[in-house]
Amino acid sequence: MQLSEKELSSINDLLSEEELLTKKFKMLAEQATDTELKDKFTNISERHQQHFNSLYKLLG
């Protein structure tokens, strides 16, 4: 599947956002002292990593 320049640009923007969110929630999980909160932040970080991986696969 051939992607247009606009599509590639959008995917790259989304990759940057997902990478930032993954790092942000991972950092919050590391800093959290409450176990439940730490688990939630970790799960959110993992979900954003999955989104990143899915988007990255589109680039081939």
Regions found by a protein language model. Give the residues of each.
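His/Met- and acidic-residue-enriched segments that coordinate or traffic transition-metal cofactors
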Residues: 1-60
